Structures are given as structure tokens and as C-alpha cells.
């Protein structure tokens, strides 16, 4: 398992514990609406900035129970707080504070509201 994937798995575990919710590594099969909101964490891109520093892009997708256009809870504050807490307690050699941006908000195939957060970090490889 690469260090990138270890960090992604650590973020999944950290979010799951801090939000007290199940966090997925790929889009799950939804059996009932009680599973919403869905939180899916995936590795997007990674590249070496220098021989010792690696850049990692992670997408955190939140899919809410509500249909797009309604009022929905994208959990942005909760996710931001949980990621800050994870970072503060992280044992990884992360360079500086990671960036969290809202990358995109668009409906899923079945019309539910979906928000993608782009989490970027650099770490000592």
C-alpha cells in the first residue's frame, strides 16, 4: 500500500470517528435513505514536487438525502472541523496546513444534492 493510500485511509478513519458516521472509499450501493448523507473520500492526483515532498489531492464528496435545489446540509463546517482536528493530531509529516476548497456542487444521477470538497496537502515522502 502506498503512502498516499495510507493517508487517504487515515483520513477516512479520522472523519468516520470524528463525525460518528460511516465514510466510504467509493460510491456505495444505497439500500435505504437512512444511509444519507453519504461521505466518500477518494484519492485524485498525486505528484512529487521535489524528491522529498509529495502533493496529494483528495476528493471528499458529500451526497445528501435532499433533492438538488432544496435546502441541504453539505456538512461543510463539520467536515472542515473534522479535517482540522485530524491534521492537528496527524502523525504524517505534512508541510504547512492543507487546503480545503469546495470544488463542485452538482446533482447526482438520481437528482440528489452533491458537493465535492478538494483537500490538498503536501507531505514529506
Give each language-model segment a name.
Residues 1-24, 42-125:
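Charged, amphipathic alpha-helical segments and their flanking helix caps
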Residues 24-33:
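Short acidic low-complexity segments
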Residues 33-44:
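A short, hydrophobic beta-strand-centered structural micro-motif
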Amino acid at each position: 500500500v502506498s503512502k498516499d493510500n495510507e493517508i487517504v485511509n487515515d483520513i477516512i478513519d479520522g472523519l468516520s470517528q470524528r463525525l460518528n458516521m460511516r465514510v466510504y472509499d467509493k460510491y456505495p450501493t444505497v439500500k435505504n435513505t437512512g444511509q444519507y448523507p453519504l461521505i466518500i473520500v477518494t484519492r485524485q492526483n498525486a505528484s512529487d514536487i521535489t524528491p522529498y515532498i509529495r502533493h496529494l489531492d483528495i476528493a471528499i464528496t458529500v451526497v445528501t438525502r435532499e433533492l438538488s435545489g432544496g435546502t441541504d446540509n453539505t456538512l461543510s463546517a463539520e467536515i472542515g472541523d473534522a479535517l482540522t482536528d485530524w491534521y492537528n493530531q496527524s502523525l504524517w509529516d505534512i508541510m504547512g496546513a492543507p487546503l480545503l476548497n469546495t470544488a463542485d456542487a452538482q446533482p447526482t444521477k438520481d437528482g440528489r444534492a452533491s458537493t465535492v470538497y478538494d483537500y490538498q496537502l503536501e507531505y514529506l515522502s
